[in-house]
Amino acid sequence: MTEFVVLIPARLDSSRLPGKALADIHGKPMVVRVAEQAAKSKAARVVVATDHPDIQTACQAHGIEVVMTSNRHESGTTRLAEASAALKLPPHLVVVNVQGDEPLIAPELIDRTAEVLVENNVQMATAAHELHDFDELMNPNAVKVVLDKNRNAIYFSRAPIPYPRDAMRAGKREMPSETAVLRHIGIYAYRAGFLQRYAEMSVSPLETIESLEQLRVLWHGYPIAVETAKEAPAAGVDTQEDLDRVRAVFQTV
């Protein structure tokens, strides 16, 4: 398998759950739990990228490699661009972006996302899973993605895509039957050199409207390969209820 590293963007500010990166999960901060889970993958190296000294201290206390970045980043991807430059990662090296609020992420998903990037010879790869619930299709917090025949992303949106026009006209809460509806999974793989290119690209209007950083890549004409996971991954931590659920999982381990 191609060598890759995991970079984890982590910030302390969170509108829905302040300080969640350092939230205690069975005796360890969440960001440490994420890094330990990522270390179960085939990654050659796992590094947390943060702008906060408290996160840096927590990672160092648990033996997690950490690199400090600016506090002016609008997205995790630009933070990782700075981190990869600071770490002097070679341009060809594969980097997997694991979100800092995913303490239950499957190591196999990390490995597979890196593989998809290499297999498809693209600049960026991500993942999705089939969606079967109508309420989730309509939920703007559930990001959907539609693919072309080559399994590359056509578009990501918080809106219901593909839109079931006939069912909606008839007042029916039915999922599209002609194709699978896919919910995006927030994991990315890219070459370190492309991270630098991403940071230099202009912000796209679609990215701003939808608040989805991956739309910058499509806007500038680069394909994004999408791996379809066999099942939905464990949910990340956005709210206190999510945190309580994750804590319960770790208590049973």
Curated annotation (Swiss-Prot):
GO MF terms held by the record: 3-deoxy-manno-octulosonate cytidylyltransferase activity
Gene3D superfamilies: Spore Coat Polysaccharide Biosynthesis Protein SpsA, Chain A
Pfam families, sorted: CTP_transf_3 (PF02348)
Catalytic activity: 3-deoxy-alpha-D-manno-oct-2-ulosonate + CTP = CMP-3-deoxy-beta-D-manno-octulosonate + diphosphate
Membrane spanning residue stretches: none
Entry keyword set: Cytoplasm, Lipopolysaccharide biosynthesis, Nucleotidyltransferase, Transferase
Pathway given in the UniProt record: Nucleotide-sugar biosynthesis; CMP-3-deoxy-D-manno-octulosonate biosynthesis; CMP-3-deoxy-D-manno-octulosonate from 3-deoxy-D-manno-octulosonate and CTP: step 1/1; Bacterial outer membrane biogenesis; lipopolysaccharide biosynthesis
One GO term describing the cellular component: cytosol
Assigned EC number: 2.7.7.38
Subcellular location: Cytoplasm
Annotated InterPro entries: Cytidylyl_trans (IPR003329), KdsB (IPR004528), Nucleotide-diphossugar_trans (IPR029044)
GO annotation (BP), single: lipopolysaccharide biosynthetic process
Enzyme class: transferase
Function comment: Activates KDO (a required 8-carbon sugar) for incorporation into bacterial lipopolysaccharide in Gram-negative bacteria.
Family, per entry: Belongs to the KdsB family.
Protein name: 3-deoxy-manno-octulosonate cytidylyltransferase
Organism for this UniProt entry: Neisseria meningitidis serogroup C / serotype 2a (strain ATCC 700532 / DSM 15464 / FAM18)
Encoding gene, per UniProt annotation: kdsB
